[in-house]
UniProtKB/Swiss-Prot annotation:
HAMAP family from the UniProt entry: Ribosomal_uS13
Function: Located at the top of the head of the 30S subunit, it contacts several helices of the 16S rRNA. In the 70S ribosome it contacts the 23S rRNA (bridge B1a) and protein L5 of the 50S subunit (bridge B1b), connecting the 2 subunits; these bridges are implicated in subunit movement. Contacts the tRNAs in the A and P-sites.
Biological process, per Gene Ontology: translation
Region (Disordered): 92-126
Assembly description: Part of the 30S ribosomal subunit. Forms a loose heterodimer with protein S19. Forms two bridges to the 50S subunit in the 70S ribosome.
Protein name: Small ribosomal subunit protein uS13
Signal peptide: none
Length: 126
């Protein structure tokens, strides 16, 4: 099993798809990496030679921020927005949509589940 950037790539998938299991690498970036290293994209991960794995690992580590470094960078960017008090920072802090989406309805993913509110009790019928 090939281990790149701390992630075990699935053995039976094509290299192109296997690389997308690394946080920060999507399909187009995986294709760029494969083109730069000269690895055949149709090769299965289990069929990669040690030289291929080393080439892929070197390309990713030298030219891309992935996994923990990328997560840390994103959290620092959000923290910076919160600290300087921008509108986007306030939205992050309040747990609301940041990019101008409506909140009167929808936005359930960002706001979380509905909070139930106790309704008025019905008066006993006569």
């Amino acid at each position: 099993m090939a281990r790149i950037a701390g992630v075990d790539l699935p053995r039976d998938k094509r290299v192109e798809i296997g690389l997308t299991y690394i946080y920060g690498i999507g399909l187009s970036r995986a294709q760029e990496i494969i083109a730069a290293t000269g690895v055949n994209p149709d090769t299965r991960v289990k069929d990669l030679s040690d030289a291929d794995v080393t080439a892929l690992r070197g390309e990713i580590e030298s030219n891309y921020q992935v996994e923990g470094d990328l997560r840390r960078l994103e959290s620092l960017n959000i923290k910076r927005l919160v600290d300087i008090g921008t509108y986007r920072g306030r939205r992050h802090r309040m747990g609301l949509p940041v990019r101008g989406q409506r909140t009167r309805t929808n936005a359930r993913t960002r706001r979380g589940r509905r909070q139930t509110v106790a309704g008025k009790k019905k008066a006993p019928g006569k």
